[in-house]
Amino acid sequence: MSLDNTKLLDFLGEIDKELKRKIIIVAVGGTAMTLLSVKSSTIDVDFTIPSEYYDDFEKAKKIIQPGFRVDVFHDGAVFTTMLPDDYLKKSKLVKTKLKNISLHTLHPVDIVITKIGRLDSRDEQDIEYCIKKFKLKENHIKKRAEDIGYARNDQVFIDNLQSVLKKFFPEK
């Protein structure tokens, strides 16, 4: 199932109705790219949520049963990548009419960093879209990459990073 901005916000509107208090959620990956209008839709829904709001979101999600996959990570973790503590401060606020959800997206450089960790062909395409749309510079990606934690083999991340930099920032 393909989810565009409207479907994502409809889903979050249903979650919003079930919440008993205000929470913060941060869209990652294709979800963030859809909300930032980099992509027209996403095939899955992914968030990283500060721990104090994680259970609230999960309870609401269980009640509404969205009918599509929703992956939720804790505190700046995104798949096998652990973003620095400032990921939330660097995130971008998405203006919505939601009452109990403060919706953010990862900063575009953090989207790129998390996609480098997995780096399949779709991730490469997403990285290219982010670099072009947000005019990301090689040094910004390198610097941010130095700050992250990686749950698999660090060498895999380093190799993926080098591959991305070589592909999208060829030496002049």
List each language-model region with its residue ranges.
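Compositionally biased terminal segments of proteins
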Residues: 1-172
